[in-house]
Amino acid sequence: MLIFAALLQNLLFTPSRNGKIRLLVDHFRTVPDPERGLALAAITRDLDIPSVKPALLRELVSNRVDEELFRLSYDYVGDLAETVALIWPVPGGEREDRNDAPTLSEVVDALLAASRREGPALVEGWLDRLDASGRYALIKLVTGGFRIGVSARLAKQALADFGQVPVEEIEELWHGLEPPYESLFAWLEGEADKPVSAALAPFRPVMLSHPVEDGDFSRLDAADFAGEWKWDGIRVQASVDNGVKRLYS
C-alpha cells in the first residue's frame, strides 16, 4: 500500500500529462505483478470492491473521534478520505519504524473475499497499520473515489508507452482483460504473445475526424472515401458480435 500511496500522491501533485505518464510507466517498470496491475485497475476504476462504502468510514471514525471535532475537521478539509486519513488516531501513536503495512494485493484479495460484515474490521485494522498517506490511498481504493487527474485513456497511453505499442492495440484488448492484467504486462515486456481478447462485441478505437480542404478535391477520388459531417457532442459506438450488443461512449 505504501508504494501505491506514493504513486497516488505523485500523480496528484504532478500537473502535466506527460509527467503523469512518466510516473505510470516507471511504476509499471519497477513494481511486480500483481501489484502494478491492481494499481492500474484501481486508477481506471475497473476494480469493484463491494464490501466497503463511504458511510462505513463515517461509522468507523465516529468510534474513534469526537463527533463535533470530526464535523469541524471535515468542513475545513473538504474531502472525506483526506479528513479520515489525517484525523485517524492510531493506538499508541504514529510510529515511523512500523513495517507491517499491508500490500495492495493483500488488501484487495481480503476485501474481495470478505462479506459486508467482515469488511469494516479489515479496514479498521489497516487504518491502524498505515500512515496518513497510506490511509488516504486505502480509503480512495475501497471507495473508488480517485480524483488524481488520470483518465482511463491516459493510463492506456502509459501502457502503450511502456510496451512501445500503439495505444489502439491496448484499447482493442482492454474490455476482454481482467485485473491484474498479467498476460497484458507479459506481452508488453516481450515475454509472451499478445493476449487474445475473449470479449464479444469489443470496442474499436474511433478514427479522429479529418477536414477536407478545397485543394484536396483535385487530387482525391471521392469514390475511395466515406465521409460524414463532424457533429459536436459525445461519440457513441454500437458493436454487435454473435448476438452480443454493446454501446460504448
Which ranges hold each PLM region?
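N-terminal nucleic-acid-engaging modules of covalent nucleotidyltransferase systems
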Residues: 1-249
